[in-house]
UniProtKB/Swiss-Prot annotation:
GO terms for molecular function: heptaprenylglyceryl phosphate synthase activity; magnesium ion binding. This is Heptaprenylglyceryl phosphate synthase. The gene is pcrB. It comes from Bacillus pumilus (strain SAFR-032). Pfam families: PcrB. One of its GO terms (biological process) is glycerophospholipid biosynthetic process. Its EC number is 2.5.1.n9. InterPro entries: GGGP/HepGP_synthase_I, GGGP/HepGP_synthase_sf, GGGP_HepGP_synthase.
Amino acid sequence: MYDVTEWKHVFKLDPNKEISDEQLEAICESGTDAILIGGSDNVTEDNVLQLMSKVRRFLVPCVLEISTHEMIVPGFDLYFIPTVLNSSHPDWIVGLHKDAMKEFGDLMSMEEIVPEGYVILNEECKAAKLTEANTALDIDDVRAYARVAEHLMKLPIFYLEYSGTLGDIELVKETKAVLSDTVLFYGGGIENAKQAEDFAQHADVVVVGNVIYDNFKEALKTVSAVKKSS
């Protein structure tokens, strides 16, 4: 079984975006610790399955981050299930999770399921609007959510999601300071190796996504930058 506590760098691929076979091979053989497949826009069972089947040709762990139960397909190494702690709608905290377990609980291996405590901090991103997230949070609010995730909910991952914009590195640093066992993931706005290296000094895992599609060569450089910093 894969141990997320040993990860430092993750590439996140969107099933709704185009990537060539050559680029996918380079991503999968880059030295990243995992490939995370997920998104919030036009993600379907078909495009998830198509992308997963290509990633599975390589040895890198392949993970599905579930945003709707319609996208759940077998064959992944792990299934990340976000609970959006700062959502104002109960569906995104536990409701959709119950529905997924009702439909797929008998079919899934519980050892493959990894819950994530998500805090979305970019009010303009699609994920924030979809989940009705309260993004008007200060550092103390986020640190409190981190403590809830680790000590009350016993979640293995706490994910700070800025989704498309670079986050507050001081907030990441302060959040990490209150976590002991829960792994801190950071995602959002990483456009170059220097930014990846900076955030890797505070987050346990840096997730790199959009730059794959905007500046592929720079995306590849983030792997060594994160590993060097960690």
